[in-house]
Regions:
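Short helix/loop segments within enzyme catalytic domains
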Residues: 58-65, 144-170, 207, 214-216, ...
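Alpha-helical transmembrane segments of polytopic integral membrane proteins
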Residues: 24, 28, 52, 121-134, ...
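Cytosolic-facing loops and C-terminal tails of multi-pass membrane proteins
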Residues: 2, 93-132, 155, 159-161, ...
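Central hydrophobic cores of alpha-helical transmembrane segments
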Residues: 45-50, 269, 314-318
Length: 323
């Protein structure tokens, strides 16, 4: 396959998958908009499916082979021989023709392919920068020696049924509790605010991070991140990543509030104390990345009505069928 065919095939597939993702994202947005009682776990799965559709549609291409009907017999054309009369033809002068369309398509397709590869490279370089930053934070973090914190952590992990609890460390480089690395996970606490955190706040913060661990969010987050890298130019990819991350945080907030020991207003005060902080990927912080996300999380705490559980599985399966 030459470079022109490769560029045309990849660009056409990017366009087709992008249009499909636009329709699917519109459907998911309408469902989340007009079903406010839909639980956060289902919302997270729906946006994860939007991102997965983009990745799978791009990397896995299997055209459906349709059976062809046999061609109808075509009557042979009747050739009538006619006497040719002598004629004199003037040979036209050769003129310079226009630039072939293949050359123009070659230039456009290859340039677009190069631009797409450059964009993916920029996204990958930014991700590697975050990974290197997180690696430095984990390397410089020290083991937690506070007996109060260790006792609360062990009791909470035992009550939640976490058999292999992540190593608990303290870091001077973070502002919020953070669960880092999908492999050999580490739970880091900010050294600046650890001494001033009460037992209830510390227990809720640890519960939130352990909820991420139980949900395996660090592993599932790779699919939306991959869609954002491959479709960096598509607004739906960024929307799916943002809404999936928000629904994921709300699901962990709901897991904390399901514990009868914690009240919504107490947890809301903790979210305000944690404030706004960004975590390098792959890591999950208890703080909100933006003030808008913090406001949305606080508003979700006000929903005291029970979420819609019935039909959530059927809804997810329906979205899978449409994807």
């Amino acid at each position: 396959m030459d470079l022109v065919a490769l560029a045309d095939g990849l660009l056409s597939r990017l366009l087709a998958v992008g249009l499909q993702a636009l329709l699917l994202a519109a459907l998911v947005w309408v469902l989340c908009r007009y079903l406010p009682r839909l639980d956060a776990r289902t919302r997270a799965w729906l946006w994860w499916l939007v991102a997965s559709q983009m990745v799978v549609g791009l990397v896995w291409y299997a055209p459906v082979a349709l059976p062809l009907l046999p061609a109808e017999p075509v009557a042979a054309p009747v050739v009538v021989a006619m006497a040719a009369e002598p004629a004199t033809y003037a040979v036209p002068a050769m003129a310079a023709g226009p630039v072939p369309a293949t050359q123009a398509r070659f230039d456009t397709g290859v340039l677009l392919l190069a631009a797409w590869l450059a964009g993916v490279a920029v996204m990958l370089a930014n991700t590697l920068r975050h990974v290197w930053r997180l690696h430095g934070q984990v390397r410089h973090a020290r083991p937690c020696r506070d007996r109060r914190v260790q006792a609360l952590y062990r009791a909470l992990a035992q009550r939640l049924g976490v058999a292999a609890a992540p190593e608990l460390r303290v870091s001077d480089d973070i502002d919020s509790p953070m669960l880092a690395r999908p492999w050999r996970p580490v739970l880091m606490l900010p050294a600046s605010s650890l001494a001033t955190m009460g037992d209830d706040d510390l227990r809720m913060a640890l519960h939130h991070e352990l909820a991420h661990l139980q949900r395996r969010d660090l592993w599932w987050a790779w699919m939306p991140a991959l869609a954002q890298h491959l479709f960096f130019f598509h607004p739906v990819a960024h929307l799916a990543v943002r809404e999936y991350a928000f629904a994921r945080e709300v699901a962990c907030d709901a897991a904390v509030l399901q514990d009868e020991q914690h009240a919504p207003h107490d947890y809301g005060r903790l979210l305000v104390k944690l404030g706004v902080s960004t975590a390098p990927s792959p890591a999950l912080a208890g703080a909100s990345p933006t003030f808008r996300i913090l406001k949305r999380r606080l508003l979700m705490l006000q929903q005291t009505a029970s979420p819609l559980r019935a039909g959530a599985l059927a809804l997810t399966l329906g979205i899978v069928a449409l994807a």
